[in-house]
């Protein structure tokens, strides 16, 4: 059975195949904006992409897959974080890039073959913007910013079906006039390709034919995918939140500049809910991987829980699902210990692989796996089982001892101490540290905050 994946563009299940003469499958997925730790909603998308990468390698062979994932290291959020902390932009983005890599490794996500940064590809972005200017798809505003003219691309909206939703995409398409905004865009739906330098940007600007500034968000993916994968790629993926406007804008930029189809296949994973609600800081349900580790859960349990729902359906993430995941992993470890060496029993686990080949149906794959496990070892062998574990990205090493959960009262003391330290009230901060120590905890300060660990006895 061939690997088939739902295509967000055609709304059909389609077989994945490389299109270039060298037989290499070219795969791009949007990476993080590195200004803060990624949360588990972000990691659902990255884990899904990791499963896809693994299945592509099983299908075509590892040397025949080329995976690119970008890092957005300059935008409004990264610049604001650097300004607020009084640090160079590169220091801030390096810190959060390192953290992202560490979390990906803990979740057993394969690193991309190439991980380009926006700041490392300014020339490529300027060149693509210049191409769009030359072809009449972009224009320079009075302040030096450059905008893409949405009305110049007749196919705009075909990915997201914006026209079907009667979304205003410009006076030329919608037949209605729209007010010109403060940035002097010709139409309200036009989007920035190049942002003219403003005082809040600090030193984070570059020279261009239109004056100093920085690239817009959308152009980076078009420029970097072109450089590293070519003008037409086989697959572009991301979370459903990126479908519009980001991916729609990528198509417009790339196809207007290059004159060929940008991506042959599009795939989007759905949102993650926590306890049935959308994640938000105000609800206290915006978990990072570290948050869950501090509650005593292993990264593999987090990965397993993220696989428990179909990637194209919303997944309700709960702490109960993590407890269930830990038990499931223990069962898989015990099962593997009963298996003998060998490698001829791939047919035993064929239903698991078949489920993954059918639109990455991870819950069906896990169900098929436990049907096999519950029957006993039978003909199964270690190598065949490990092949399935590779496909799912599950490492069955013995988990480390779980960390103790921090009591709410200790967390409250830590928050007060951190606030006192930020206010330079060091006497209060020292007194609160002693209270925390008396409760059996150590508070460790970091540049970006603090951590709590049980005090050493």
From Swiss-Prot:
EC numbers on record: 6.1.1.16
Subcellular location: Cytoplasm
GO molecular function, one term: cysteine-tRNA ligase activity
Principal cellular location given in the protein's record: cytoplasm
Positions with a binding annotation for ATP: 281
Co-factor(s): Zn(2+)
CC annotations in GO: cytosol
GO terms classed as biological process: cysteinyl-tRNA aminoacylation
Keywords: Aminoacyl-tRNA synthetase, ATP-binding, Cytoplasm, Ligase, Metal-binding, Nucleotide-binding, Protein biosynthesis, Zinc
Binding site for Zn(2+): 30, 221, 246, 250
Alphabetized InterPro entries for the sequence: Cys-tRNA-ligase, Cys-tRNA-synt_Ia_DALR, Cys-tRNA/MSH_ligase, Rossmann-like_a/b/a_fold, tRNA-synt_1_cat_dom, tRNAsynth_Ia_anticodon-bd
CDD domains according to UniProt: CysRS_core
Subunit structure: Monomer.
Protein's name according to its UniProt entry: Cysteine--tRNA ligase
